[in-house]
Amino acid sequence: MQSSSELFPVALVSAELRGDLSEDVYRLKPGNSPDSTVELAVTRLGLAGQENRGVPVILLHGSFSNRRFWYSPRGIGLGPHLARAGFDVWIAEMRGHGLSPRNQAYKHNSVADYARYDLPAIAAFVRE
């Protein structure tokens, strides 16, 4: 569980045990975008009680989707499969999707914004 960052403000929204998995949900406020209201939800999956995690993997959903594409409420999907295989799984939710709140300029969000601002911030947080 990571509850802070030296890069930008981070809040631990929830820390849950779901069967054999641990699920930590973070809200990042990178502040690197022209829209300062952007906040990004990132879910970290791992095996409950496992201290040492493997290679990090970041999963991104497609348009009109959210983290549930990779991780169902019943613990099924690629995310849990990778976590059970020993990977350090991070599931990002883009601006205004899933647990990421809508930002002020929500109607103007673009894939270019995700690539230029959001993905580098998520990768830096995971790397930290």
Regions found by a protein language model. Name each.
Residues 2-6:
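Flexible, low-complexity segments
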Residues 7-12, 75-80, 110:
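Secondary-structure junction/capping motif
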Residues 108-127:
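Alpha/beta-hydrolase active-site loop
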